[in-house]
């Protein structure tokens, strides 16, 4: 290939590229809308509503809020959402913010805050519960005997005034406030009385003991009369002496010794 042919081959693409650029510039100039009239211009957004610094928009890179002005191409909803998220959610954090030097302490602080918040809501939302006695207290209360005296908390002021006005020397008036009836027996006291009755034994009196000794002596004499003769058997049969006769013999011997 000669040198002249190489130069002509380079000149043709350069001319084609220059023509394409001029056609694109001409098409952009034709598409751009005409400048709006002054009375159709919208008021700009306040400085607090804008996410970034307020600057004049460039024709190639529109910012958020610049599409409200006439003459600027409006971005699509996806582009607007992406710019909003990039300004709010994906803002760069300061250096060292994501790297906590003591993550365990940070976790404990977070758990402590959650615990305090939970306790606060429990105190507000949950109703106050009354104190309930255990079942053992109820069982002991049922077995206790009734209280006979009036408690200091149950005394009425009117009752005390009436007691002061009434003459206690009068038995009829005193019976109103001081009943003489015996208190009803409690189950524990009645059970103890029954045990005492079972354990107590009747003690014989002197008349009963003398009658018993006379009857025993008469029965012994009758048995001696009906008993066989000792000479018949050839051997004496010993007779059992009762304890009462021994006591009687001891009692009869003592006064003789004293005399």
UniProtKB/Swiss-Prot annotation:
It comes from the Eukaryota. Residues 27-56, 174-259 are annotated as: Disordered. The modification Phosphothreonine is found at residue 237. One of its GO terms (biological process) is apoptotic process. InterPro entries: Dysbindin. One of its GO terms (cellular component) is lysosome. The modification Phosphoserine is found at residues 217-218, 242. Belongs to the dysbindin family. This is Dysbindin domain-containing protein 2.
């Amino acid at each position: 290939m000669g040198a002249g042919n190489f130069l002509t081959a380079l000149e043709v693409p350069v001319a084609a590229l220059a023509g394409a650029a001029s056609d694109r510039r001409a098409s952009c100039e034709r598409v751009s809308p005409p400048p709006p009239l002054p009375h159709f211009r919208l008021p700009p957004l306040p400085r607090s509503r804008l996410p970034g610094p307020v600057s004049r928009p460039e024709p190639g890179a529109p910012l958020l809020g610049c599409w409200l002005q006439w003459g600027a191409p409006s971005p699509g909803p996806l582009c607007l959402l992406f710019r909003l998220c990039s300004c709010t959610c994906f803002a760069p954090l300061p250096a060292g913010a994501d790297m906590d030097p003591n993550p365990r302490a940070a976790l404990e602080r977070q758990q402590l805050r959650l615990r305090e918040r939970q306790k606060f809501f429990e105190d507000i939302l949950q109703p106050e519960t009354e104190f309930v006695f255990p079942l053992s207290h109820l069982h002991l209360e049922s077995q206790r005997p009734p209280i006979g005296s009036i408690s200091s908390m149950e005394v009425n002021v009117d009752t005390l005034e009436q007691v002061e006005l009434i003459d206690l020397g009068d038995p009829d008036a005193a019976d109103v406030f001081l009943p003489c009836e015996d208190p009803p027996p409690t189950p524990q006291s009645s059970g103890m009385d029954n045990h005492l009755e079972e354990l107590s034994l009747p003690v014989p009196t002197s008349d009963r003991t003398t009658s018993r000794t006379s009857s025993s002596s008469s029965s012994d004499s009758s048995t001696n009369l009906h008993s066989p003769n000792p000479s018949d058997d050839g051997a004496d049969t010993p007779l059992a002496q009762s304890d009462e006769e021994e006591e009687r013999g001891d009692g009869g011997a003592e006064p003789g010794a004293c005399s």
